[in-house]
Amino acid sequence: MFEIHPVKKVSVVIPVYNEQESLPELIRRTTAACESLGKEYEILLIDDGSSDNSAHMLVEASQAEGSHIVSILLNRNYGQHSAIMAGFSHVTGDLIITLDADLQNPPEEIPRLVAKADEGYDVVGTVRQNRQDSWFRKTASKMINRLIQRTTGKAMGDYGCMLRAYRRHIVDAMLHCHERSTFIPILANIFARRAIEIPVHHAEREFGESKYSFMRLINLMYDLVTCLTTTPLRMLSLLGSIIAIGGFSIAVLLVILRLTFGPQWAAEGVFMLFAVLFTFIGAQFIGMGLLGEYIGRIYTDVRARPRYFVQQVIRPSSKENE
């Protein structure tokens, strides 16, 4: 039997990108939720290259009297998951909770995640109830969840919700993974022995707009497909085999038709030949694009450039920049 260690210190990791309107409320509510735990805690706010006043507000929050806030400033925008990984590399708690800065997932749910983790779970996920998102966001989320479940075999209900709790050894394992395209909830479930999901409230966004545009969702879909599995390459080989068999069958059929109806039939079959040709060319371009995605991922990983660059770290105790 594995020994279950009680949670002694909680680290809350929150990526921030142009969230100056929501920051005061976010800090107040997250601090209140952590105070109610009766445990040691820290709140790590990672500025992901914001162009508004977010970074300055984070520095002020860290330097306030009695603050528990650690501000991590990245030199530019690297994306949500890279920013969270930057926060993971600076945590000191034995339970790490991730949370979005838009307050759609209430910080008041944090005590429930801590209580569930204290039962011995490595990962505590959440499922958003009564989602306050647009029809497009809900549909895209369902498609992504189904894709992940099919490729990973992990039947988790809501991979898109970033309100999650991870034991320290899970975070340490993720930090040892150096691939550039990282999707944290899936990566955590790969290392987790015991994982569970609990329902949580979901509020309407009060400040700003979602940072996930249509194109960013498309890019996320490509990242998920290419960083999780090589199944698309196997499917591409299968598709190529089917097309080759189909092409050979059509060639045999055309020879039979020519012998049956004579050479005058050949001119009438030109348009069908063009249709078949364009179908094959289209399939080839799809395959080339998919191979290009995989090769691009390999090229990016082989260069081994850091996935983020931390410009400053402001801790409340010393109030000095690292």
Swiss-Prot record:
It catalyses: UDP-4-deoxy-4-formamido-beta-L-arabinose + di-trans,octa-cis-undecaprenyl phosphate = 4-deoxy-4-formamido-alpha-L-arabinopyranosyl di-trans,octa-cis-undecaprenyl phosphate + UDP. Keywords: Antibiotic resistance, Cell inner membrane, Cell membrane, Glycosyltransferase, Lipid A biosynthesis, Lipid biosynthesis, Lipid metabolism, Lipopolysaccharide biosynthesis, Membrane, Transferase, Transmembrane, Transmembrane helix. GO terms for molecular function: phosphotransferase activity, for other substituted phosphate groups; undecaprenyl-phosphate 4-deoxy-4-formamido-L-arabinose transferase activity. It is found in: Cell inner membrane. The chain crosses the membrane at residues 236-256, 270-290. HAMAP family: ArnC_transfer (MF_01164). This is Undecaprenyl-phosphate 4-deoxy-4-formamido-L-arabinose transferase.
